[in-house]
Swiss-Prot record:
Coiled coil: none annotated. Keywords: Glycosyltransferase, Transferase. UDP-alpha-D-glucose binds at residues 260, 319-321, 336-344, 358-361. The lineage of its organism: Eukaryota, Viridiplantae, Streptophyta, Embryophyta, Tracheophyta. It is an enzyme of class 2 (transferase). Its EC number is 2.4.1.-. It comes from the Eukaryota. This is UDP-glycosyltransferase 79B9. It comes from Arabidopsis thaliana. One of its GO terms (molecular function) is UDP-glucosyltransferase activity.
Length: 447
């Protein structure tokens, strides 16, 4: 092994991308390597507590330039609706001079990126190796981001007849297609021009999709494993939730969260609340206030709060999701199946019910429910609407001990969890990935 290397990280300005990049940075720093993490100034405060090695991981703040159409002060994807994503993308591209100045001054060995398609070209000029690092699933990349791919249509040779879109997914495809064409160009350009492809996944879950991407791009795909964060024992579950959950029997509580990007329409939000009530089980729902509402309370169905006051909570702020999933009282996780939440569900003991909204979430859902058969998807109408009855039926089907479907997904989930948490599996991915990077840097230095 040669000397330690210095890596730059430049992820898309969304916390769903920056946070797993920082988890990877922690793994590199744990092995003695240095990381310079480029991000918007506003994002630094929210990420600092995830930095376990502040002496080796240095945040390098970028000034986000003004772009017509981008609201004043918006610096991350959580500051804007999805429809304004193209303006944040334009602002990211305008940071190129700042990024290049940092590369010139600090001379890293590697630079990790995802949507900034111009990084490989810039990196080559400075003799830096570029690594495109995906924090979305391999199935999404295989379905959407191979050369010549078309939104919603599986490409030739795609390795699954189950991980696909259905007719009622048109609502999500339509929403995403607003800026899909440009995003597709950015990512496929990055894939074609980068030195190495890496994905936050493991072959036990997505091996055939990784093999397919390798064949399409004719280069090795490096896997990091899911890069789950280390448990933060210094920050136990808030007393508010610990005391509330302790009231209920083991495995009886439904926990529902739909990610930071999803804001429901008011009528769909109310249907979600009523579906939870219909199960008759205790529940904790953590979602953003719906469109047109400033608070959760003003949007709740009439009489709902009084009816569920002893066994149901709807919360509009951030919660400690991994710690809630680990609480003995929680037995079911209703999730949008974003890639991070997907992994958290797989290594939990909870039954899994899926309610996807965005394109990659839909494909992750089909992987989980149809390919791996470890979860149940909530049935939707052609418009994308789900009813309180369909939500309640999905939850009841996995929570009922006598349900044939519930027993099937419970058995399959338990087997898969056993594989994923087996000693050495996930650390093995990290070790091999870091060793490969070290060899890449050593070989480059010998050129």
């Amino acid at each position: 092994m040669g000397q330690n290397f210095h890596a730059f990280m430049f992820p898309w300005f969304a916390f769903g991308h920056m946070t797993p990049y920082l988890h990877l940075a922690n793994k590199l720093a744990a092995k003695g390597h240095r990381v310079t993490f480029l991000l918007p100034k506003k994002a630094q405060k929210q990420l600092e507590h995830h930095n376990l090695f502040p002496d080796r991981i240095i945040f390098h703040s970028l000034t986000i330039p003004h772009v017509d159409g981008l609201p004043a002060g918006a610096e991350t994807a959580s500051d804007i609706p999805i429809s304004l994503g193209k303006f944040l993308t334009a602002a990211m591209d305008l940071t190129r001079d700042q990024v290049e100045a940092a590369v010139r001054a600090l001379r890293p060995d590697l630079i990790f990126f995802d949507t900034a398609y111009w990084v490989p070209e810039m990196a080559k000029e400075h003799r830096v190796k570029s690594v495109i690092y995906f924090v979305i699933s391999a199935n999404s990349i295989a379905h959407e981001l191979v050369p010549g791919g078309e939104l919603g249509v599986p490409p030739p040779g795609y390795p699954s007849s189950k991980v696909l879109y259905r007719g009622h997914d048109a609502h999500a495809l339509l929403t995403f297609s607003i800026f899909y064409e440009r995003l597709h160009y950015r990512i496929t350009t990055g894939l074609k021009n980068c030195d190495f492809i890496s994905i936050r996944t493991c072959k036990e879950i997505e091996g055939k999709f990784c093999d397919y991407i390798e064949r399409q791009y004719q280069r090795k795909v490096l896997l990091t494993g899911p890069m789950l964060p280390e448990p933060d024992n210094s920050r136990p579950l808030e007393d508010r939730w610990n005391h509330w959950l302790n009231q209920f029997k083991p495995g009886s509580v439904i926990y529902c969260a739909l990610g930071s990007q999803i804001t429901l329409e008011k009528d769909q939000f109310q249907e979600l609340c009523l579906g939870m009530e219909l199960t008759g089980l205790p529940f904790l729902v953590a979602v953003k206030p719906p469109k047109g509402a400033k608070t959760i309370q003003e949007a709740l169905p009439e009489g709902f709060e009084e009816r569920v006051k002893n066994h149901g909570v709807v919360w509009g702020e951030w919660v400690q999701q991994p710690l809630i999933l680990a609480h003995p009282s929680v037995g079911c996780f209703v999730t949008h199946c974003g890639f991070g939440s997907m992994w958290e569900s797989l290594v939990s003991d909870c039954q899994i019910v899926l309610l996807p909204y965005l394109c990659d979430q839909i494909l992750n859902t089909r992987l989980m429910s149809e390919e791996l058969e470890v979860s149940v998807e909530v049935k939707r109408e052609e418009t994308g609407w789900f009813s309180k009855e369909s939500l309640s039926v999905a939850i009841t089907s996995v929570m009922d001990k006598d349900s044939e479907l519930g027993n099937l997904v419970r058995r399959n989930h338990a087997k898969l969890k056993e594989v994923l948490v087996s000693p050495g599996l996930l650390t093995g991915y990290t070790d091999e990935f870091v060793e490969t990077l070290q060899n890449i840097v050593n070989d480059t230095n010998l050129e």
